[in-house]
């Protein structure tokens, strides 16, 4: 490709509204342009990368035995009513009506559409297993689109759906897709981790996310220092620091704490260690509880894991905190002075709190706390659950090593849906005995456009993008110095361009009438892995200059050997 016939569209300055590195560099490198909030046009350079990611994903998903299809981005609303997700998805599901006032949605995912298709097309166990996928535009009406294509409203996604006669078949399909994901991300040259995850609004049982590791990642992932255990912060199991509760050494006393409305103030003003405090959080209760609100009790230095809390049958979903008026009406005190001692409302205790002794907690009277509290002496322990986020150094739940935390960007997710959708939509087949069997489903997604941004977050330097070779927009750049003034430079550049392109190598030939400094900066910004510089001075010495973008090195290569040198770099 010649730059004179290409839309390069690079920018010298970083746009003010670009927060993260990938957004900044995608704009500066001429990969995308914003059309509206969360909506982006992919320019030629960006589209080349997007297509390469797509093709790698397509090849590996094909190799896993899946079959490509293409479903409409517009879906009938009635399908979403069949599964009950029409309300569960909330405002992210964009709804509209056509001219006949028939309701539709813009597809954020396609479980309903694919299940409807399979129930009409597949009738016998002999047609199974079946795995169908598409690479298609999706739309989610994000409340706050940000970070460029990382969290856009419109995005490109690979979504696949497997159908099996039993759970054993589902596990095989799931494992095959897990392996396909690993092969795809390996080929892309990304540092990533598969982690245990919560199934969220998709539903189902087993689920794993694939995270590209990056400091800018929105998600925290926890992994063991001595095993393969890894989970996102929502799913990571928090193990108590000990299995034994120490014997009480203090009597319970009442302490005046008029100015301590937070754990931090309690610790600062009264000298109690933060790990000896507990905080009591009140949330709306579900219909399973004979109360309007329920208390969740965690250690003072820990954070409530809202996903774990919401998954408890006693807690209303979505999670909603009780307000101050409710607390005063039911307990007679406000937040900051509440605790389990004497509490006449149901409560659930975190594992770490269950092994505490001699701890401090609110006394359910404004401006007062109890110190020296002990379970089963001053208050009955009751139900114990995992309620908190893990922290660095926690014991790994696998029993090996401790947990470390890193930031990651979710680029893929795989689910074992089971019969959650197939049962709701009556999707079954006749088995070998002629009996109707509801199908076991799996669901698999890769955010193709998000992979592009994630790769940049992981691969950049002060000069621009440093693409992994497999997904770079071009493999080689040819930069001829003053070719419009030097005929022999032009001839050498044209000859080399013809040779490399004939070999199937993707080359960007910078034939612009520009200053060398401008050309070099653009090539580095775009992130092309290999650059060949051709100039009169180097030709006088019988060589071209070769630059390696990732290694940030340059070397003189004899003119006659340059093609072989490039071939060696690419092997």
Swiss-Prot record:
Single GO MF descriptor: ATP binding
Main location: cytoplasm
Keywords, sorted A to Z: Aminoacyl-tRNA synthetase, ATP-binding, Cytoplasm, Ligase, Nucleotide-binding, Protein biosynthesis
GO biological process, one term: prolyl-tRNA aminoacylation
InterPro entries: aa-tRNA-synt_IIb (IPR002314), aa-tRNA-synth_II (IPR006195), aa-tRNA-synth_II/BPL/LPL (IPR045864), Anticodon-bd (IPR004154), Anticodon-bd_dom_sf (IPR036621), Pro-tRNA-ligase_IIa (IPR002316), Pro-tRNA-synth_IIa_bac-type (IPR004500), Pro-tRNA-Synthase_IIa_type1 (IPR023717)
Catalytic activity from the UniProt record: tRNA(Pro) + L-proline + ATP = L-prolyl-tRNA(Pro) + AMP + diphosphate
GO cellular component assignments: cytosol
Enzyme Commission numbers on file: 6.1.1.15
Location of this chain's protein in the cell: Cytoplasm
Keyword Repressor: no
Subunit text: Homodimer.
Comment text on domains: Consists of three domains: the N-terminal catalytic domain, the editing domain and the C-terminal anticodon-binding domain.
Family as reported in the entry's similarity comment: Belongs to the class-II aminoacyl-tRNA synthetase family. ProS type 1 subfamily.
Function: Catalyzes the attachment of proline to tRNA(Pro) in a two-step reaction: proline is first activated by ATP to form Pro-AMP and then transferred to the acceptor end of tRNA(Pro). As ProRS can inadvertently accommodate and process non-cognate amino acids such as alanine and cysteine, to avoid such errors it has two additional distinct editing activities against alanine. One activity is designated as 'pretransfer' editing and involves the tRNA(Pro)-independent hydrolysis of activated Ala-AMP.
Annotated protein name in UniProt: Proline--tRNA ligase
Gene: proS
């Amino acid at each position: 490709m010649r730059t004179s016939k290409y839309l390069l569209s690079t920018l010298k300055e970083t746009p003010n509204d670009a927060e993260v590195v990938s957004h900044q560099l995608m704009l500066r490198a001429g990969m995308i342009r914003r059309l509206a909030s969360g909506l982006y046009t992919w320019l030629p350079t960006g589209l080349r990368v997007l297509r390469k990611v797509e093709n790698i994903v397509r090849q590996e998903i094909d190799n896993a035995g899946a079959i490509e299809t293409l479903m409409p981005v517009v879906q009938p609303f009635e399908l979403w009513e069949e599964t009950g997700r029409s309300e569960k998805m909330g405002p992210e599901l964009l709804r509209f009506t056509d001219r006949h006032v028939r309701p539709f949605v813009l597809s954020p995912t396609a479980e309903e559409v694919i299940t409807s298709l399979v129930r009409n097309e597949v009738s016998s166990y002999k047609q199974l297993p079946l795995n169908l996928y598409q690479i298609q535009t999706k739309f989610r009406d994000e409340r706050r689109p940000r970070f460029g294509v990382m969290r856009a409203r419109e995005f490109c996604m690979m979504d696949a759906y497997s159908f099996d006669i039993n759970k054993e078949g589902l596990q095989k399909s799931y494992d095959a897709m897990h392996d396909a994901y690993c092969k795809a991300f390996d080929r892309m040259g990304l540092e990533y981790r598969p982690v245990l995850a919560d199934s969220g609004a998709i539903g189902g049982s087993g689920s794993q996310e694939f995270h590209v590791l990056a400091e800018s990642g929105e998600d925290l992932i926890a992994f063991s220092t001595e095993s393969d255990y890894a989970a996102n912060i929502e799913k990571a199991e928090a193990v108590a620091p000990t299995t034994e509760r120490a014997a009480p050494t203090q009597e319970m006393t009442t302490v005046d704490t008029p100015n301590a409305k937070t754990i931090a103030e309690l610790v600062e003003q009264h000298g109690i260690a933060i790990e000896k405090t507990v905080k009591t959080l009140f949330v709306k209760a579900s219909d399973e509880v004979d109360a309007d609100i329920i208390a969740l009790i965690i250690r003072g230095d820990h954070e409530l894991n809202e996903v774990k809390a919401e998954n408890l049958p006693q807690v209303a979903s979505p999670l909603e905190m009780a307000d101050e008026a409710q607390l005063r009406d039911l307990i007679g005190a406000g937040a900051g002075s509440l605790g389990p001692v004497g509490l006449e409302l149901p409560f659930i205790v975190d594992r770490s709190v269950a092994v505490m002794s001699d701890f401090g907690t609110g006394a359910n009277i404004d401006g007062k706390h109890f110190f020296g509290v002990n379970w089963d002496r001053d208050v009955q322990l009751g139900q114990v659950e995992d309620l908190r986020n893990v922290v660095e150094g926690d014991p790994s739940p696998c029993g090996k090593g401790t947990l470390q935390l890193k930031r990651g960007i979710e680029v893929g997710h795989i689910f074992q849906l089971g019969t959650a959708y197939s049962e709701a939509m009556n999707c079954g087949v006749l088995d070998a005995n002629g009996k109707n069997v509801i199908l076991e489903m799996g669901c698999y997604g890769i955010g193709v456009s998000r992979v592009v941004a994630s790769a940049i977050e992981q691969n950049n330097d002060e000069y621009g993008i440093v693409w992994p070779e497999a997904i770079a927009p071009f493999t080689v750049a040819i930069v001829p110095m003053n070719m419009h003034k030097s005929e022999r430079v032009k001839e050498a550049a044209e000859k080399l361009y013809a040779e490399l392109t004939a070999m199937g190598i993707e080359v960007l030939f910078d034939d612009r009438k520009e200053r060398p400094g401008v050309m070099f900066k653009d090539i580095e910004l775009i992130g092309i892995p290999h650059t060949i510089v051709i100039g009169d001075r180097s030709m006088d010495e019988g060589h071209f200059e070769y630059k390696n973008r990732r290694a940030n090195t340059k070397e003189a290569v004899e003119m006659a050997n340059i093609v072989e040198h490039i071939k060696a770099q690419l092997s």
